[in-house]
A protein has these predicted regions:
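A short, amphipathic beta-strand motif
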Residues: 549-557, 628, 638
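A short, solvent-exposed loop/turn motif at the edges and junctions
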Residues: 592-621
């Protein structure tokens, strides 16, 4: 039977001082499944009984090994009283005819972890398989197969010992599009296996490095209806879909890594007919203004200030987050590549970032790249994309919600104490603000330094990034490609001891300064990543833990549905933010009680009277959609697009509470015409009257 000792039983054992064999007594909090216990099962094949040496209990089971697929399997399945972390150890009798690669697999709450043990040495004692999280009951197990080196594998006892949980951390690598990783099924299989062997729990896969398909690593690494597919993918293969399936089977998250603004290295962008037809969406350096698309830092790049560019990028985010079971979206190069950029390729385009700046600021002419107000506006442009993407990711129809919204953050030079002195600030990447506002769930600071040359830079950035995390996760991006194994291990250990929320290594395929060395993965699992761990939870996205929620929406001209740029949004009378070029706003960290909190949100914009919604429900960890139509706004036009149609009816159906059963769900206040905190037949009659308007 499975042996679980209570405190009372332990006391009796101490008094009796029983020792049936020469092995130590079972300790409190331990569960041991021997090969004669009910929790042990022969799943397949022939297993003989042996008693040579000093087994745990009376005997053990053994099977002849085989090459290729396993022909014999056994399982130890404990009954655990509580969910939690457990040290898992195996007992076996060693011998010269034993396999030196006995294939154990631990099936735990977050997936399955293969471990290979040398049974020729170290037996007649407990040998660790690692520390794993198990759910209470009988859902966990340890399995042994016989596909190993000659001649036999030994199945004796497995011990599960409850321990304190290691700190949850994000352990990922960047898998870039320029090397092996996910171009075909075998590459994905190998990548996932290496992630498991290294005790990684997430993969950041570069599914969009360029928006054209001119050469390898350019194009989409998923079946996209928006971006042309990359040319170096095996025929008929969907890299992202297959990667998600294989990684999830191993308990590993997959995050879609996207570069938003980098389109191509030549004009026009091959295969991308949408971007070919919109050269006005591109940004150039100040000296190239108005001359059509020109390279910036050798690359053709989109204009971060263009509303149409934002919509194009959000369509990509929605496709990934809604159509694929990704676990997150990860941005890279979410910044300007140089300060002397952000100017329009075509001056006739009235929605360029520069034209928006002129309209909003009242400035005339073309500002210098060093102009402080113009620089602040370019920071605003990039921030507008990040905060909008935060909503698209958080509200995606995805079974893995809550998804993680993350970004790679630059950390060039030594770490200053003021964020405005950072290289990120100079490239208009205001990432401390993004973390402070909660637009990111985690920032991944690209702390890429050779530890033999710049040890203080690395450590200073680790320490400073923790201070700038506010109440979100900060993760250290570490560079094996610049270091030998020993220095990488030293850097990772420093960051973990400092208290970061995780490590991301760059990159999957380049694991040392000497190049590609796959032995990195068993090395790191034997050192800094010694045990498998779970990813950190996001308490701000858990309604049982969070104390705040988010309001978002669009502000439009109610008569036409056209977006209103730079409208001011107020919460309970206080200014809380402005709309972007698409009329989109996001207000985070709004206090909410256990049952939600009603608050007033209002909007003011030049040329319109103020519009007030007095009873907007904010829910803990919730995302309340609150759209505004300025001027002539039809009752029932939920999405404020200038009409009352089937889209609005779908919303009304979900908000209909009946009399006295309010308040309506978050966002439903817009249908409560008589402001009696419900949506009933009175409100429905008004909706009917305007439907089709």
């Amino acid at each position: 039977m499975s042996r679980v000792l209570t405190a009372a039983a332990w006391g009796r054992l101490v008094l009796l001082v029983l020792c049936i064999t020469c092995h130590p007594l079972i300790s409190y909090g331990q569960t041991i499944v021997d090969n004669t216990d009910p929790g042990f099962s022969i799943l397949s094949g022939a297993w003989s009984t042996g008693s040579f040496g000093t087994p745990w209990g009376a005997d053990y089971r053994w099977a002849l090994t085989t090459s290729g697929a396993a022909s014999a399997n056994v399982e130890w399945r404990p009954t655990l009283n509580a969910s939690g972390w457990y040290d898992v150890d195996v007992f076996f009798v060693d011998g010269t005819n034993r396999a030196d690669d006995a294939p154990f697999t631990v099936h735990h709450a977050t997936g399955s972890s293969p471990i290979f043990l040398d049974q020729q040495v170290g037996g007649a004692s407990w040998v660790s398989l690692g520390t794993f999280y198990f759910d209470a009951g009988t859902t966990g197990a340890v399995e042994l197969a016989n596909n190993a080196s000659p001649s036999v594998v030994i199945a004796d006892a497995v011990r599960f010992t409850a321990v304190g949980a290691p700190q949850p951390r994000f352990r990922a690598f960047w898998a870039d599009a320029f090397n092996v990783g996910f171009k075909n099924a075998s590459q994905v299989d190998e990548m996932v296996a290496r992630a498991v062997s290294g005790n990684y729990n997430a993969i950041l896969a570069e599914v969009l490095a360029y928006h054209d398909n001119a050469s390898n690593a350019h194009g989409a690494y998923w079946d996209s209806s928006i971006v042309p597919k990359a040319p170096d993918i095996s025929a008929g293969f969907d890299p992202l879909a297959y990667m998600i399936t294989k990684a999830h089977q191993a308990g590993i998250e997959v995050h879609a890594w996207i570069l938003p603004y980098r389109v191509s290295t030549s004009w026009p962008p091959s295969g991308n007919t949408l971007l070919q037809s919109h050269p006005e969406w591109f940004s150039v350096m100040r000296g190239d203004i108005g001359g059509g698309p020109q390279p910036v830092s050798g690359l053709y790049q989109l204009d971060p200030g263009s509303p149409e560019v934002q919509e194009y990028l959000m369509s990509i985010v929605r496709e990934l987050a809604n159509d694929y079971e990704v676990d997150g979206v990860h941005w890279d190069y979410i910044r300007y590549t140089q300060p002397d950029a952000g100017y329009p390729a075509h001056t006739w385009y009235d929605n360029s970032g520069l034209e928006r700046y002129r309209r909003i600021s009242g400035a005339s002419g073309t500002p210098l790249s060093s102009d402080a107000a113009w620089s602040d506006f370019r920071r605003r442009e990039v921030t507008e994309l990040v905060r909008r993407a935060n909503i698209e990711v958080a509200t995606a129809d995805n079974p893995n919600q809550p998804l993680r919204h993350t970004a790679a953050l630059i950390t060039w030079g030594d770490a200053p104490t003021s964020f405005s002195a950072t290289s990120a600030w100079a490239r208009f990447q205001n990432w401390e603000h993004w973390l402070d506002k909660g637009y990111l769930d985690a920032g991944v600071a690209m702390t890429y330094y050779d530890d033999s040359q710049f040890p203080s830079y690395y450590r200073n950035w680790v320490d400073q990034s923790i201070l700038w995390a506010h109440d979100r996760h900060i993760v250290t991006g570490q560079a094996p490609y610049l270091n030998d194994f020993s220095n990488s291990n030293t850097q990772i250990s420093y960051a973990q001891a400092a208290g970061v929320d995780g490590i991301v290594t760059f990159s999957y395929a380049t694991t040392s300064s000497a190049g590609n060395d796959w032995s990195w993965y068993p090395f790191v699992s034997g050192n800094a990543f010694a045990d498998p761990i779970v990813l950190p939870t996001m308490p701000w996205k858990d309604p049982l833990v969070a104390s705040a929620g988010t309001a978002y929406g669009r502000v439009t001209d109610g008569a036409t549905g056209d977006p209103v740029d730079d409208a001011t949004v107020f919460v309970n009378g206080f200014p809380a933010g402005e709309t972007d070029g698409n009329g989109f706003f996001v207000i985070t960290k709004l206090s909410a009680g256990p049952n939600g909190t009603l608050g007033e949100i209002s909007v003011s914009a030049a040329g319109f009277s103020q519009v007030v919604r007095p009873d907007v429900l904010i829910e803990r960890a919730g995302y309340t959609e609150a759209n505004f139509g300025m001027g002539s706004w039809w009752f029932g036009d939920y999405d404020a697009d200038g009409d009352v149609d089937a889209d609005d009816w779908l919303k009304f159906e979900r908000m209909w509470t009946g009399p006295g059963l309010g308040p309506p769900p978050a966002g439903g206040d817009v249908f409560d015409d008589d402001e009696d905190l419900d949506v009933d037949l009175h409100d429905f009659s008004l909706f009917q009257a305007t439907f089709g308007s």
